[in-house]
Amino acid sequence: MTLLLDTTIPRTLDVLLARFAQRPATRVEAWLFEDEAARREAEAVLAGSGTEARLYSAYKPLLHHFLETVAPARPRRVTVRTPAGDFARFRLEAYPLAALLPDTALSFVPGELPLAYEVDLDGQVQRVFVPHRAGAQGGSCGWLRVWEGEALVEDGPLETEFEQAYQAVMAAVGAHAWPAAAPYFGTLQIEVETGGIERRLPWQDECLSTREALHEEFYFAILAGFQQRAGKPDGDRTLQPGQIVPLLRAGSGDTHVRVSVLPLAPAAPEPAPASVPVPAEAAPGGLAAAIAPLTPAQADAAMAALGGEPFLHASTQGRPVRGAYFAGAGPALVVTGGQHANETSGVVGALRAAQALKQRGAHFAVVASENPDGAALHQRLRQDHARHMLHAARYTALGDDLEARQAPPYGEKGARLEAIARTSARLHLSLHGYPAHEWTRPLNGYVPHGFSQWTIPKGFFLILRYHAGLDGTAFLDTLTARLAADPELAAFNAAQLAVWDAHAGELPFAARHGIPCMLMEDHRSTVPFTLVTEFPDQTVYGAAFRLAHTTHMRTVLHAAELLQEGWLS
């Protein structure tokens, strides 16, 4: 192990309390990455020492303003003028306000104030300060205002522990002498124990979490740094830097940060599939009851139990990547799940679909869990943060997107390639998910770079890729009509699309029968048609998880029927 950083950062709130206990001010306003309870307690302490204080959230300040002061009043009409500049960003930063005010006529219009929202509540106008740094990134930041008598003597950014932890990690990673070429490390582990905001919201799976935001900042910023180091283009998915693992833990008081480089670790030995005690939800016929992601061992056992002609490949860390081929009748298809391992419902959907296709005597191959190393990391991270997106588990243990591998050794991708070769499939169904609650990068422009279309949920949607000269429009129109016949899915999509419209505006691609659909000519696969399913499944459990994998399964089965009927001939 190589230690890059081991440091402690004082809690900004405690620093302020100590400062104004020693020398009280007339009035203080501060914006911090702290939850409401901690801020209110600190206000009382400051008042006791002679300082009038009001402490606000630096993260999503307009939303917190409504949660903490406006929502109980239930206004009938609200008009929000966003800060000058990036209208789309500041409208998104207010999400999911539209869902939390269902009986309120809410509208957003571009404003002119540089660092504030202007909010009209039934004719009463309020200003809500929005601390963020100038420049292209426009990151959220702490802020401090201090009055001595009537004089404002301090008014500017306050570097909080949230920001300092991020900067310390990025500086340590940037200063290290890395190898000249990838892979740069086995595992780059970032351990942070810190306080902050962790608040569930009363709208579907929405939550506010500064620790989740730090996870996302660390993972994507570090990955982008190594892409630049390697001379890769923006958004590249081929680089294999190693596995980046942010470990965020809840703490109180000071923030502790530790960054270390570890060798690539092989997977711990797992029992043979036949000896795994498979729970009822992973047993054939019982997957319909699944309300949570399967473990890698459970998914492997369920794949082994399918039958058919098995084939086996190995992951980077040595885990089995299992496939099964069924030489049935009719045109062939391939079904895969778990390419991105934090998108968990597709694994169950693929297994359920495979069971049904087998009973129908269909011609197909299935690889239900393509990325077991990522799944193992997701299982590990989920122990601490079951409701976080955990994008560090998205890619393989080498740090790349397995679909992007274009040359041997193919590793995990070998199972997909064998499934395609065995079937000569005309259609590949790749079952995916995306965040079920808002995805933010508050220190780097707020909206995740390269993922602006994925930042808030827009319901279940489809992406159809096709080779030049082909047309899947009629297929997609018929498929969505059949899928929309499920009233639960239809209601789910309608609710999410209404909130999307309020906070993001027009969809980036048209909806068919209430299901957004993207069509694109694409040649990344040898299969003529690739249908990607996208359900907002990251972090969901219970009935929402069941709807997710049921929708994946229904999509596969309806698509197989349409393929059989000649809609993709």
Give residue spans per PLM region.
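C-terminal accessory segments enriched in acidic
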Residues: 1-293, 422-423, 442-569
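Soluble metallo-hydrolase cores and metallopeptidase-like ectodomains found primarily
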Residues: 277-330
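Generic recognition of flexible, low-complexity loop/linker segments
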Residues: 310, 322-323, 416-417, 518-522
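Conserved catalytic motifs of the protein kinase core domain
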Residues: 330-332, 528
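Active-site/substrate-binding loop(s) of hydrolase catalytic cores
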Residues: 331, 344-349, 359-470
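Short hydrophobic beta-strand that contains or immediately precedes a catalytic carboxylate
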Residues: 334-337
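Mobile, glycine- and charge-enriched loop segments
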Residues: 345-354, 358-408, 509-569
